[in-house]
Swiss-Prot record:
GO terms for biological process: chiasma assembly; mismatch repair. Residues 1-44 are annotated as: Disordered. Heterooligomer of MSH4 and MSH5. Interacts with HJURP. Interacts with REDIC1. This is MutS protein homolog 5. It is linked to Premature ovarian failure 13: An ovarian disorder defined as the cessation of ovarian function under the age of 40 years. It is characterized by oligomenorrhea or amenorrhea, in the presence of elevated levels of serum gonadotropins and low estradiol. Spermatogenic failure 74: An autosomal recessive male infertility disorder characterized by non-obstructive azoospermia due to complete meiotic arrest at the spermatocyte zygotene or pachytene stage. Some men exhibit reduced testicular volume and/or reduced testosterone level. The keyword Disulfide bond does not apply. Widely expressed, with high levels in testis and ovary, including granulosa cells. Also expressed in fetal ovary and adrenal gland. Involved in DNA mismatch repair and meiotic recombination processes. Facilitates crossovers between homologs during meiosis. Keywords: ATP-binding, Disease variant, DNA damage, DNA repair, DNA-binding, Meiosis, Nucleotide-binding, Premature ovarian failure. It comes from Homo sapiens. ATP binds at residues 592-599. GO terms for molecular function: ATP binding; ATP-dependent DNA damage sensor activity; double-stranded DNA binding; mismatched DNA binding. Belongs to the DNA mismatch repair MutS family. GO terms for cellular component: nucleus.
Length: 834
């Protein structure tokens, strides 16, 4: 607004910056570029909601889910599933949906499965809501109609109905009947719940920015316990809960050391790859080719430049979603502009790289000229500095002559209003020392004069020829003939400019949304490049090598492998090799003292295999990975009060998963199974489980068992044959000390060396010596004599007396009363002994 002030001598002054009166809301502080960036980062860390729709019929599964983080519907073509619904369980474990939608008319197996899912208290707070919709909502024809009649921003408005059907048919497999019905039911649920648009007008539909297919056919089966014990993921409490929405951060884990992604969507894709390890050799080889290319010394500068560009790739789906809902922020245009220009930089860089690598070829071809069009439109239309200054969308000059003219008139108001105020002051009472003419959007032009001391009551505010409006900050505001004339002449310039610029913004949004498909593809390929650059960076720093994949090799071969986490925490790390291919040594029994490295070796084998199955280089000189379809572990008990299970019961559940599901191509890692119960029972269970697998012959899984049960070998509880191989951790006794070499070699440990471990733990020397003495006596079959220093006075004599009484007892005497004997003879003597 403009204003004019006059001093008591009634001399008009030049214009000064006006301020809105206290009766009107002041504009919000204008965020600078840094604040806008921080605001965007917070948006990117919003927790996503996933809503899953599932149907199961005649042994086939139809699945579709909506992800609010990218406003995309993901679907899986009809896939066969067992009656136990293992495939559905895998999907649930992977995506953790907030709600599961299905038909009220459902198969008994599905009903039982969902009922069990809803009652799993240990899933809190992630337990999904189970929602049953009428079966009519999943009808095939009505589902097709919903899909074809949907309002999708990625489909141009110029498409005819026939072209729209052909376009959607190229994306959605309409021949997969269960999938189509699941998609239709999901759309019905989204429309009924109005996910993401709960507070919008009813004519605003749920934004859907695309359809994506996902497959689970080539995935390697890994359960949550395995992810936990191998430390593939590890969440820790964040020191500042304000930094992360969930209050958690990644701890020391495989994901933590490999995650060097520069954009949030790269990090998200890396996590997805970790949850979906695959044995698809084509996909794995394509990932390794990119990593190997960037590991070449001459390509280091190119990798760094690409990483810098990827740092500007932001959350495009969130921006497109806000455009769809007309909730675009000022910072969104700048973020989108940087993202598109960075994508163009990626395209130009990849065009100079070898096109024999699939990813470079895809980026060079699919980052089309639509990106240039979007960047050019935004760059020519949006006034970034003006938008940040006014905290709203503004356009550059020479876009709309009418807007430019109104802005010129608005900019010329201060000097014009100075002249108007001078004329108004001439007509006012001489007691009024000064006046100003101000402009307030939506209200118009007003005459503002200071409140005089004589103006006490409301009636004193009346001035002839002026209409009193309001009092604010000791200023009286009036409408005069001239201000009314200004309103009629100039109108509400500010609001008119704003309305016209909003219309231009809407037109620009439509242009961007019409090309949403290319932006979505940009994000997919850029995030893939980001992940592979991150894996290449980790491989370079940690000295990883490229694994080989051989479907003919049944197992894993590792030359001088290392534990990827342990080698970062230890000063020195001893590498170990692994050979478990073919029909020999499919069951490896590893014995050795505590702290000799058995558990680390098991985890090392599991982690190297896992890294190879996500397409990463591995910590080994050489690694050859065969056809592995699952990794099962029984290494650590994930205890929880909410489970209501004992430690041993949890161990049994983990082993049961492996026994029931492991195939000839599975890798099974078992550490100290049976220690949670009686020694004899634990040993018997371990032997029974291993004999069960050995009975399968060549179809036995690849099993690594670490145990301290030396009796398993000494008593020959396992059948002899080429399937069993005994390994031990090499050690050496140096006087009273035990030296660990942490090297795996063939053989069997001679002793557990528990006394050395007890001494290292700080137990008193007397206790350690006594324990060793008792152990030697038991092993040699000799009687154990008590320690005299620990006996009470006359304790041995009292024991002998009690034994003599039992020996003299005549059990055949008909007059014998055992109750009297126990109460009068035994109990008093036992009391004195104890």
């Amino acid at each position: 607004m403009a204003s004019l002030g006059a001093n008591p001598r009634r001399t008009p002054q030049g214009p000064r910056p006006g301020a809105a009166s206290s009766g009107f809301p002041s504009p919000a502080p204008v965020p600078g570029p840094r604040e806008a960036e921080e605001e965007e980062v917070e948006e990117e860390e919003e927790l996503a909601e996933i809503h899953l729709c599932v149907l199961w019929n005649s042994g086939y599964l139809g699945i579709a889910y909506y992800d609010t983080s990218d406003s995309t519907i993901h679907f899986m073509p009809d896939a066969p599933d067992h009656e136990s619904l293992k495939l559905l369980q895998r999907v649930l474990d992977e995506i953790n949906p907030q709600s599961v939608v299905t038909s009220a008319k459902q198969d008994e197996n599905m009903t039982r499965f969902l009922g069990k899912l809803a009652s799993q208290e240990h899933r809190e707070p992630k337990r999904p809501e189970i929602i049953f919709l009428p079966s009519v909502d999943f009808g095939l024809e009505i589902s097709k109609q919903r899909l074809l009649s949907g309002n999708y921003s990625f489909i141009p408005d110029a498409m005819t109905a026939t072209e729209k059907i052909l376009f959607l048919s190229s994306i959605i497999p309409f021949d997969c009947l269960l999938t189509v019905r699941a998609l239709g039911g999901l759309l019905k649920f989204l429309g009924r719940r109005r996910i993401g648009v709960e507070l919008e007008d009813y004519n605003v539909s749920v934004p859907i920015l695309g359809f994506k297919k996902f497959m689970l056919t080539h995935l390697v089966n890994i359960d949550q316990d395995t992810y936990s014990v191998l430390q593939i993921f590890k969440s820790e409490s964040h020191p500042s809960v304000y930094k992360v929405a969930s209050g958690l951060k990644e701890g020391l884990s495989l994901f933590g050391i490999l995650n060097r992604c520069h954009c949030k969507w790269g990090e998200k894709l890396l996590r997805l790859w970790f949850t979906r390890p695959t044995h698809d050799l084509g996909e794995l080889s394509s990932r390794l080719d990119v990593i190997q290319f960037f590991l070449l010394p001459q390509n280091l500068d190119m990798a760094q430049m690409l990483h810098r560009l990827l740092g500007h790739i932001k959350n495009v789906p969130l921006i497109l979603k806000r455009m769809k809902l007309s909730h675009t922020k000022v910072s969104d245009w700048q973020v989108l502009y940087k993202t598109v220009y960075s994508a163009l930089g990626l395209r130009d860089a990849c065009r100079s790289l070898p096109q024999s690598i699939q990813l470079f070829r895809d980026i060079a071809q699919e980052f089309s000229d639509d990106l240039h069009h979007i960047a050019s439109l935004i760059g020519k239309v949006v006034d970034f500095e003006g938008s940040l200054a006014e905290n709203r969308f503004t356009v550059l000059p020479n876009i709309d002559p009418e807007i430019d003219e109104k802005k010129r008139r608005l900019m010329g108001l201060p000097s014009f209003l100075t002249e108007v105020a001078r004329k108004e002051l001439e007509n006012l009472d001489s007691r009024i020392p000064s006046c100003s003419v101000i402009y307030i959007p939506l209200i118009g032009f007003l005459l503002s004069i200071p409140r005089l001391p004589s103006m006490v009551e409301a009636s004193d505010f009346e001035i002839n020829g002026l209409d009193f409006m309001f009092l604010s900050e000791e200023k009286l505001h009036y409408r005069s003939a001239r201000t009314k004339e200004l309103d009629a002449l100039l109108g509400d310039l500010h609001c008119e400019i704003r309305d016209q610029e909003t219309l231009l913004m809407y037109q620009l949004q439509c242009q961007v949304l019409a090309r949403a498909a290319v932006l979505t593809r940009v994000l997919d390929l850029a995030s893939r490049l980001d992940v592979l650059l991150a894996l290449a960076s980790a491989a370079r720093d940690y000295g990883y090598s490229r694994p080989r994949y051989s479907p003919q090799v049944l197992g894993v071969r590792i030359q001088n492998g290392r534990h990827p986490l342990m080698e970062l925490c230890a000063r020195t790390f001893v590498p170990n090799s692994t050979e478990c291919g073919g029909d020999k040594g499919r069951v490896k029994v590893i014995t050795g003292p505590n702290s000799s490295g058995k558990s680390i070796y098991l985890k090392q084998v599991g982690l190297i295999t896992f890294m190879a199955l996500v397409g990463s280089f591995v910590p080994a000189e050489e690694a050859e990975i065969g056809a592995v379809d699952a990794i099962f572990t029984r290494i650590h008990s994930c205890e929880s009060i909410s489970l209501g299970l004992s430690t041993f019961m949890i161990d049994l559940n983990q082993v049961a998963k492996a026994v029931n599901n492991a195939t000839a191509q599975s890798l099974v890692l078992i550490d100290e199974f049976g220690k949670g119960t009686n020694t004899v029972d634990g040993l018997a269970l371990l032997a029974a489980v291993l004999r069960h697998w050995l009975a399968r012959g060549p179809t036995c899984p690849h099993i690594f068992v670490a145990t301290n049960f030396l009796s398993l070998v000494q008593l020959q509880l396992l059948p002899q044959g080429p399937l069993v191989q005994y390994l031990t951790m090499e050690t050496c006794e140096d006087g009273n000390d035990l030296v660990f070499f942490y090297q795996v070699c063939e053989g069997v440990a001679k002793a557990s060396h528990a006394s050395h471990t007890a001494a290292q733990a700080g137990l008193p020397d007397k206790l350690v010596a006594r324990g060793k003495e008792v152990s030697d006596l038991i092993r040699s079959g000799k009687p154990i004599k008590p320690v005299k220093d620990l006996l009470k006075k006359n304790q041995m004599e009292n024991c002998q007396t009690l034994v003599d009484k039992f020996m003299k007892l005549d059990l055949e005497d008909p007059n014998l009363d055992l109750n009297v004997f126990m109460s009068q003879e035994v109990l008093p003597a036992a009391t004195s002994i104890l």
